[in-house]
Regions:
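Post-signal peptide N-terminal regions of Sec-secreted extracellular proteins
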Residues: 26-133
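Short alpha-helical segments used as structural interaction elements across diverse proteins
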Residues: 1-4, 77
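Sec-dependent N-terminal signal peptides of Gram-positive bacterial secreted proteins and lipoproteins
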Residues: 3-25
């Protein structure tokens, strides 16, 4: 009887593992080149990213940049392509690499698309990395 119970439990465990679907948020790579020059963009946007969780913040990882604390470069979450409304606080990036949690100040919903905006107010800034809404 004990052997049969172990077999049944093992079979159930295998079936659960086979049909379990891992849930991971959509991670989008970004690369921004911003500048205050007349012929340059002072802000740029990532591609649309699908929000797949109910967290109250977005996650941004800067993997390479020329950012310093004097650059006055900010990240913000905005709506999908065509919607330039801000959905989060603006967070100033102050280091060449790092992780930023950007908290939402408006309702956001799982299943909707959002974009990351990078904006400079002072100097030429290049930054790249990945983010998830």
């Amino acid at each position: 009887m004990k052997r049969k119970s172990i077999r049944v439990l093992s079979l159930i465990l295998v079936l659960v593992l086979l049909f379990a679907v891992p849930v991971a948020a959509q991670v989008i790579n970004y690369s921004f080149y911003t500048d205050m020059a007349d012929d340059a963009d002072d802000e740029q946007f990532s591609a649309n990213a699908l929000k797949e969780d109910d967290l109250d913040y977005a996650f941004v990882r800067v993997t390479d940049s020329n950012i310093t604390s004097y650059d006055n470069f900010t990240f913000c979450v905005v709506g999908q392509n065509g919607d330039y409304s801000s959905y989060s606080q603006e967070v100033q990036a102050t280091a060449q690499t790092g992780v930023y949690n950007i908290y939402y100040n408006r309702d956001v919903y799982s299943g909707n698309n959002y974009r990351l905006r990078g904006r400079t107010s002072a100097y030429y800034v290049h930054t790249e990395g990945r983010w998830e809404p």
